[in-house]
Amino acid sequence: MASQQVTVNSLAFDGSVRRTWQCDLVERRDPLVVFVEHGELGIIQKGTISYEYYWLDRWYNIFRFHEPDGTFRNYYCNVNMPPTFVDGELNYIDLDIDIVVWPDMSYQVLDRE
């Protein structure tokens, strides 16, 4: 599959855009959509490799982060409403519960408000 640039929008519960970014579509096997991003990721070190896994029928997505040298860093799991993917744009409503899973399989629950 030729690389396709897409826009991902993380939305608040009221539908307003919290964060938006560009990435490349690397796989689509409904209901799974996989993106890769190599850009500036906010507080994440520039050059970090981010693989993003979204299922159009599930209430979560998973980011797999690698250091710039390719070493696995961690998984980051977002609890969200099932996303939509239409015309090169993926939108999901973030439900503000996140889980970080480290290489030793320990984890930390974040954003419980």
What are the residue ranges of the model-derived segments?
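Short acidic-glycine loop/turn motifs at beta-strand connectors
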Residues: 28-30, 68-69, 102-106
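Structured beta-strand/loop patches that form or line metal/cofactor-binding pockets in enzymes
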Residues: 53-97
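A hydrophobic, small-residue-rich beta->alpha segment in the mid-to-C-terminal subdomain
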Residues: 95-113
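Charge-rich, low-complexity N-terminal segments
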Residues: 1-49
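A generic structural motif
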Residues: 9-13, 66, 100
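Well-ordered beta-strand positions
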Residues: 25-27, 54, 100-101
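Short, solvent-exposed aromatic-acidic interface loops
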Residues: 39-42, 81-82, 113
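Structural beta-strand/beta-sheet cores of well-ordered domains, especially the beta-sheet scaffolds
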Residues: 4, 21, 73-75, 97, ...
